[in-house]
Amino acid sequence: MYANSRKRSNVDVHRHPYVVYGSPFDLEPSRINQGVPVWKQEARDERNRKRFHGAFTGGFSAGYFNTVGSKEGWQPKSWKSSRNENKSVHGMTIDDIMDEEDRADQELSKVYTSKINTIDTSIPIDDPLLREFSNRDDSIGEKMLKNLGWNGHDFVISPFQGYYDDTKLTNQAYHGIGYQADDVFQLERKPVGMAKNLRGGFGSGVLNDDGIEDQDIYDLGAPKMRYDKSINITKKVASPFTPVKHTFLSKKDRSKGKSIIKSQNCSDGLPPLPGFVVVFNLQSPFQNNWFPPPTIPEGWEPKLFTNSQGFSQKKAQTSNERLPLFAEKSETNSNGEASLPSDVNHGVKEDEGSWQLIDIETAKNAMSRKDNPYNDERAGIYEIFLKAHLMNMPRLLRDIDSRHLLEFTQTASLYRPMSKNLSMRFVSSFEASTKKESINSHSETDDSILRRPRTVVTFIPERLLCKRFNVALPYGQEKQKRKNISSIENVPIIAEIENKSIDSIDTRKLNRPQDIEEKPKAPQTLFSAIFGDD
């Protein structure tokens, strides 16, 4: 049964798919130009060109194209005249000789076709002849049906459909994906029932054999060129073992002494059962090859490893035992005695009190307080922390968390005695005096400092400095050259120069009149003529 083949009218094709109900109302004037795209906002002429000249008619070309060299325009890097090239390249087109009327006629003469293929819609879907002449694109559903064998009318079954059906085959791919199968596992299979049929007789093809006509004179045989290192030499590949089938020997064969394969012993060293043969040798690739260990020469002793008993007998060093190691690396004083820095000496504690986080006085003050700073389960742990320092029992701190130990140490440090706080913040006068004495003794004994050159320079202030302090220039505008007085070995002369009084300076230089050329001042009449009121 065919569908209606009548062509649809243009009214049905271009009919709006929705039903309009009611009368549309006009938008507000302020909302008419809303949502206009950018390409509609550009000023173009009737030929869709941006060629408006003049500030009041668009100003696009006048403000952009004709502003070469300005900030808003295009700045050429190199200029080259194209006067001669334009003559050869330029050619007349039909648009150059057409006016507005010609363009209007050309626009009317154009033929527009609808994108909707109305002819194809009237073709029945089951007519194969008309479907061949149709030129529309197939839909996605039709493409999927064609891939399944649909030709437009019914499904065509391929003759090779049964050839590609999955069959139950034995899995022999033991080598895995991405690897190549080994020839060892490909056991040879003898054809069953073929050897009995190939016994006697010959065919009639021997009588009809011409011999010469079927022979190719250009036949050179199989290609002898191979991608091997050797040519015309068949290289024998030695297999690790020869695959053998399980074979049962009858009594008749055993009596005649026939044996297909020489029997071998099993892995346990015993011969196989009568009538059976071992398939794999003992030296199969599945067994690991164990090589004998290297022979150790006589008298050899290891150098990198010591006796294992030495590790258990060795004890950890205490802080007092490690102290000489740090002292050797420290600087030595003038007497040759090793001296540690102050921070190292302060951190070194005795072995007995190395575990203590607070001193005993701080623990007593914190224990004497009746109000416990903690109200939860930490209150009991805090008392155990203080009792461990008072009773000198470090084993009580083993079960306390490290975070609680840090928190209890900061809490107990608030009850540290005042003398302890002052000693940590200030330095005693005895230590300060010893440092000064060490500096003085070092300066007195060091003769290299006295042998350095010293200079005595007369102070000549700058002119701006004298002006700021309202002091006259001591030497005038001409600055004298500074005289360097150096003495390396004569120390008494240096002392005399340093103790020289100010009176020894030459006073004649101070009392010398200033040689400043003063310019004549302008007369008063000039100022009155300029700034005076008439």
Swiss-Prot record:
One GO location term (cellular component): cytosol
Region ranges (Disordered): 310-346
Predominant place of localization: cytoplasm
GO biological process: mRNA cis splicing, via spliceosome
Pfam families from the UniProt entry: DUF1604 (PF07713)
Residue ranges, compositional bias (Polar residues): 310-321
Signal peptide: none
Keywords: Cytoplasm, Nucleus
Keyword Magnesium applies: no
Subcellular localization(s) per the UniProt record: Cytoplasm; Nucleus
GO molecular function list: protein-macromolecule adaptor activity; RNA binding
PANTHER family, per the entry: G PATCH DOMAIN-CONTAINING PROTEIN 1
Protein name (Swiss-Prot/TrEMBL): Uncharacterized protein C20H4.06c
Lineage: Eukaryota, Fungi, Dikarya, Ascomycota, Taphrinomycotina
